[in-house]
Amino acid sequence: MRKRLALAGLILFGAWSGSADAQRPEWMFGPFVKPGQVNPIIAPNGAATFFSPMSDSVVRWEELATFNPAAVVKDGKVYVLYRAEDVTGKREIGFHTSRLGLAESSDGLRFTRRPTPVLYPDKDVQARYEWTGGVEDPRIVETDDGTYVLTYTQWNRDVPRLAIATSKDLVHWQKHGPAFAKADSGKYLKLDTKSGAILTRVQGNRLIATKVNGKYWMYFNVPDILIATSDDLIDWTPLADGDGKVLKVLSPRPGYFDSWLVEGGPPAIMTERGILLIYNAGNSGKFGQAGLPQRVYTGGQALFDAQNPIKLIARSDTPFIQPTEDYERTGQYKDGTTFVEGLVPFNGRWFLYYGTADSRVGVAVWDPKRR
């Protein structure tokens, strides 16, 4: 009872995450509220150390930044895998080494971290794709048999590549390499790919990877969102038109909050009204939404046909989450960021986990009963 009252109080005194809730279509999730007393929930930690097998030295692996989290519910707790950066490299976004840390929470708000990363560049067959930039920006889903499937970006400071890893316990991971390595004779290995949001169905507190028309589906990439299919969740093939050009299922719109770019967010979710895709959006200073800063990152929602995942039905006209708090505009990315990557149903509510200014992790909560 105390936990319930505490959460209710946090939501009551939290900050609204978006705008125009009265005009929110029925298919959209929200409104999400940012609990002010706990945010940011994960921040940089200069005391944590880790022996890097690649540099053969001890590094303070989460000293600079902790951000862009994936989330999953396991054994009655919320687990967050977050991107952590050390201070090596240039003082510039994308030029530090990233590793993935793991934290757990019994209430979805207060987290305890493991002292060392669970996924990192190692002296393995993926080293050529992951060193020296590291492993970035995870999203996670579960299979029917309890296997966890992680999409993440391999960054060797040359080409970012969307990759797959699997685990049974969230701690020990098997890397499977670039998601598109076997597609079209390997041509996608030379192209920038990232931000994979696999289609799921809700089963209790679990988001289970689900098939449509006999295939698994994944929305991915930036500045347009593309789509790929798979038979096994490991090897993926982007869909293309008759001319061999990849299909763009969601693109930027002049005059809107997503005028600069759109990028995959948390796992896509099958709902009664269709496939819900929460996505990240960037605003253009020249032809974007008036009143939003140039290059600010916000969040949007799109609805796709349940039987035809490439068919867009509707999309939001305004962001449902955007930088409003100091911690969302203070850090590596000062234009402001609410970069959504983790979404889980937990104890009757939806918890949305996001990166703030490429520096910290925030949470926003939606109670469907309050709609």
Report the location of each language-model feature.
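Bacterial N-terminal signal peptides
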Residues: A8-A15
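Active-site glycine/GP-rich loop and adjacent strand/helix microenvironment
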Residues: G18
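Beta-rich carbohydrate-recognition and catalytic domains
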Residues: A22-G133, V141-W260, I269-Y333, N347-R371
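Low-complexity, glycine/alanine/valine/leucine- and proline-rich hydrophobic stretches
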Residues: D335-T338
